[in-house]
């Protein structure tokens, strides 16, 4: 079962098969049902048809190893749907290595606004250092107007630029920032960072955006 025990009731059709030294598990997971039942900003939240959830909430984890195994995640999404994490991309897979699923951070799934912002690699703006680009993925869940989403993205870009100039490069090679609208809030509210296999950040923002 996924690491969060509350997820067990949302797993169905679990089948485990062994062949040629490999074990394959197939199952269905009701992500919307899980999000509605838990609805915690530290675990999983849903706005419209988009979900921000810890990877440990819905992904099965191999057990019985002396050290955490490397896990490659390949995701196929339907038309208009997206998937993103803070994990590095290796070919067509998102790779988790050196840590367990419990510390893998947030994932963004479903119908939401996903944008990628190119950022300089950590330390790459220092004299004599090799140049390179990383990526800041920004996932905005439903609840903010189109104009408001543009204002939020501009705010994120300007903040990332300020951090880049201060640290002479961005603070991570890749990062996922999930922005979760809260109708009762003004401005920026609660935020949470999960490092692990790839840094992810969840920030609650007011549904009404004030560009000031």
Stretches found by the model and what they are:
Residues 45-57, 100-132:
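Edge strands and adjacent loops of beta-rich recognition modules
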Residues 9-11, 20-22, 68-70, 133, ...:
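Extracytoplasmic
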Residues 1-43:
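A surface-exposed beta-strand-loop module
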Residues 120-212:
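Juxtacatalytic substrate-recognition/specificity segment
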Residues 1-11, 70-89:
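Solvent-exposed beta-hairpin/edge-strand motifs
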Residues 17-28, 93-116:
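C-terminal beta-strand-rich structural cap/linker in extracellular carbohydrate-active enzymes
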Residues 26, 30, 59, 68-84, ...:
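Zn2+-dependent metallopeptidase catalytic core
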Residues 30-68:
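Glycine/proline-rich low-complexity spacer/linker segments in large multi-domain proteins
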